[in-house]
C-alpha cells in the first residue's frame, strides 16, 4: 500500500512562487491548503477535487485546524464514483467523530444509491434499500408496508400504477413509520414524500438521448428524504415521522400510459395526461394524499421534478417552494446552518390554475401560455395537499446530480439536502 499523502491546513498564504491566487502548495512533507477565511469549506472541497485529479488516492488529514465540517468538505470533493480512496482522519472529539461517521455512512449511501445503474436499482430494490438503511439506525422503532403492482391499482394509487405499469418491474409504494414513542396513537410530526423514478425514458413523450442518459438519477428525491430521515435519527429525532416513497420506472410498452389518458385520484381529482414525461408529479400525488391523511405538522416532498428549476438555478441550488413563509424561512435557516444551497422560487395561488384541461380538472403540464414550469409543477402538487397553505414544503432537487465534474464535485450524485432536512426535523 502506498504511503499516505499528508494534507495540512494553514492560514498563511502560499509562497509567492505558487502565485497570488494559490489555494494549495506542495512540499516534501505533503500538501498544504491555504485558507483565506472567506470560504474555507469551499476552498477545502475544491482542493480535494484537485488532489483526486492528481491521482492521489490515499491521504492523511494531519496537523491542527481540522474539525468535522472541514473533514466533510474534503470528503465531498475527494469522493468520486470510480476507483477507491482512503482517508486517514485526524483526531476529533467523540461528538465530532460520531457526526462525521454518520455523514459518511448515510450521505455516502445517498450518493451511491443515486449513482447506481438502473439495471441494478429498480423500484423494489430502492424501497428495500431505504428500509435497510433506516432499520440500521432505528432498529425496532420502525415499521413499514410495501405495496406493489396490481395491489396499487386495487387500493386506488392510480398515479403510481399508471406511470409504472409499462415496466416489467412493478411500481412500488413504501410507507415507513418511524415511531420512537412506542405509542401507536402518537401524532405524526412530519411526513416525507419522495419521487423514486428509477429510470425515466419520458414514456411516449420520449426524451432525447442527451436528456435521458442521466435518468437513473430520477429517484434522487426518494434517496434524499430517506437519507434525511436516517440522519435525523442519528441526531436524536424523538418525534414520529412517516416516509412515503413513490417508486416506478417510466418506460414505453404496449401497456404504457398515453397522452389524453385521464387519471382519477383518491381525493377525487381528475388529471389529463398531456405529457408522459411529466410523470413525477403523477406519482408524488399519491404520496401526498397519504401524507395529508396523517394530519402532520409538516409535509416535505422532494423530487427531481423539472428542468425549469435547473434552468433557473443550475445544479448549484435546490429549489424551494412553499405557501408557508414561516416554514420556508425555517428550512432556509437550516440550510444556512448546514452550509447547503437552497433558493426559494415563486409559488402563488395563480400557479394552481395554470394547468387547464378541456377534459379533466387538471392537466399534468402547463401550456406555452404558462411557461413557469417549476412553479406550475409545484402548483399541481398543491392540489394533493389537504392544507397546502400551511406546513408544506416542496423541494425540486436541482442540485442532486451532476452529469459532468466541476471544480468542487465529481460527476454524479452530491448528497446535498440530506443535512438540511434532518436539521429541520430535529430543530
Curated annotation (Swiss-Prot):
Query: Can you supply a Gene Ontology BP term from the record?
Result: proteolysis
One GO molecular function term? manganese ion binding
- Bilayer-crossing regions: none
Q: Which keywords does the record carry?
A: Aminopeptidase, Cytoplasm, Hydrolase, Manganese, Metal-binding, Protease
Q: Which InterPro entries match?
A: Leucine_aapep/pepB, M17_PepB-like_N, Pept_M17_PepB, Peptidase_M17_C
What EC class is this?
hydrolase
Q: Does the keyword Hydrolase apply?
A: yes
The molecule here is called: Peptidase B
Amino acid at each position: 500500500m502506498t504511503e499516505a499523502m499528508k494534507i495540512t491546513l494553514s492560514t498563511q498564504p502560499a509562497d509567492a512562487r505558487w502565485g497570488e491566487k494559490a489555494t494549495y502548495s506542495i512540499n516534501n512533507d505533503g500538501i498544504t491548503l491555504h485558507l483565506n477565511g472567506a470560504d474555507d469549506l469551499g476552498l477545502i472541497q475544491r482542493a480535494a477535487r484537485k488532489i483526486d485529479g492528481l491521482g492521489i488516492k490515499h491521504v492523511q488529514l494531519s496537523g491542527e485546524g481540522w474539525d468535522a465540517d472541514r473533514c466533510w468538505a474534503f470528503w465531498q470533493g475527494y469522493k468520486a464514483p470510480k476507483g477507491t480512496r482512503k482517508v486517514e482522519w485526524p483526531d476529533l472529539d467523540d461528538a465530532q467523530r460520531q457526526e462525521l461517521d454518520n455523514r459518511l455512512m448515510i450521505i455516502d449511501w445517498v450518493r451511491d444509491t443515486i449513482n447506481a445503474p438502473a439495471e441494478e436499482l429498480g423500484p423494489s430494490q430502492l424501497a428495500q434499500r431505504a428500509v435497510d438503511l433506516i432499520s440500521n439506525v432505528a432498529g425496532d422503532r420502525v415499521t413499514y408496508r410495501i405495496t406493489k403492482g396490481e395491489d396499487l391499482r386495487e387500493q386506488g394509487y392510480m398515479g403510481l400504477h399508471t406511470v409504472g405499469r409499462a415496466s416489467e418491474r412493478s411500481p412500488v409504494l413504501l410507507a415507513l413509520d418511524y415511531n420512537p414513542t412506542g405509542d401507536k396513537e402518537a401524532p405524526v410530526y412530519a411526513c416525507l414524500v419522495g419521487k423514486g423514478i428509477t429510470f425515466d425514458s419520458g414514456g411516449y413523450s420520449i426524451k432525447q438521448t442527451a436528456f435521458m442518459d442521466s435518468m437513473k438519477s430520477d429517484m434522487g428525491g426518494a434517496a434524499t428524504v430517506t437519507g434525511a430521515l436516517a440522519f435525523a435519527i442519528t441526531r436524536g429525532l424523538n418525534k414520529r415521522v412517516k416516509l412515503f416513497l413513490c417508486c416506478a420506472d417510466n418506460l414505453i410498452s404496449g401497456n404504457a400510459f398515453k397522452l389524453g389518458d385521464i387519471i382519477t385520484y383518491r381525493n377525487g381529482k381528475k388529471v389529463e395526461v398531456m405529457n408522459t414525461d411529466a410523470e413525477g408529479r403523477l406519482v408524488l400525488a399519491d404520496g401526498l394524499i397519504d401524507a395529508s391523511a396523517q394530519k402532520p405538522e409538516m409535509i416535505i416532498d422532494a423530487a427531481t421534478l423539472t428542468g425549469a428549476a435547473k434552468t433557473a438555478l443550475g445544479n448549484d441550488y435546490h429549489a424551494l417552494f412553499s405557501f408557508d413563509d414561516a416554514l420556508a424561512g425555517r428550512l432556509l435557516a437550516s440550510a444556512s446552518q448546514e452550509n447547503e444551497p437552497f433558493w426559494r422560487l415563486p409559488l402563488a395561488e395563480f400557479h394552481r390554475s395554470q394547468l387547464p384541461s378541456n377534459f379533466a380538472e387538471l392537466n399534468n403540464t402547463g401550456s406555452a401560455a404558462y411557461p413557469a414550469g417549476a412553479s406550475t409543477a409545484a402548483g399541481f402538487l398543491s392540489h394533493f395537499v389537504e392544507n397546502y397553505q400551511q406546513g408544506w414544503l416542496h423541494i425540486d432537487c436541482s442540485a442532486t446530480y451532476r452529469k459532468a465534474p466541476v471544480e468542487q464535485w465529481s460527476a454524479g450524485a452530491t448528497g446535498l439536502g440530506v443535512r438540511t432536512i434532518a436539521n429541520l426535523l430535529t430543530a
